[in-house]
Amino acid sequence: GGELFIELGYDRLDDRFLPTKGMYSQLKYTSSRESLGADLDFDQIEFSIYGNHTMGRHNILFGGVFNTTLDDDIPIYGIYTGGGFLNMSGYEQNSLLGANFGMVLAGYRYEVAQSGFLPGYVGTTLEYGNAAAKRKDIFSDGRVNGSVYFAYGTPLGPVYLGIGWSEDRSAVYFLRFGSVFGANSLGRR
């Protein structure tokens, strides 16, 4: 590939790993050009937004992703993927594929242990979206899914252990270490 891009980001989360308040947003325009070594000329727009609000031990998470390809023909490296924790949690990582990807989510997390070496949380999410060849099919042919999980904040980063579910598949189990917020985790290609 050969791409030029411009990216705008806004990050006011109080913690990259287990945030309790703030917002994260990213907007990116990518122009892939044959003159730069790409297989095909194509353009893509990616947008994501996530927010957190805490009241005592209760935390609310909300967010969404909308990634779209502006051209009809793209090479395989330009395809968006979905699946995995907080990115269509009811599906295996990278199991949803398409030239376009979008999802919305709402989540709740409860702080079980407020102090100590390993603060613990239990949470759940409800997510809706899909990957599709056509932009209009992302939400019109969307899939309901979500997760139930335990999270622990460790000195090396958070550990998430849980189960994802969807309306058309059996359960997906996950164990995840590290950040779930940011360009390399949520709304990734």
Predicted features and spans:
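Acidic/histidine-rich, metal-coordinating catalytic segments
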Residues: 127
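C-terminal beta-signal and terminal closure region of outer-membrane beta-barrel proteins
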Residues: 135-189
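C-terminal outer-membrane beta-barrel translocator/porin domains of Gram-negative envelope proteins
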Residues: 1-120, 124, 132, 175-182, ...
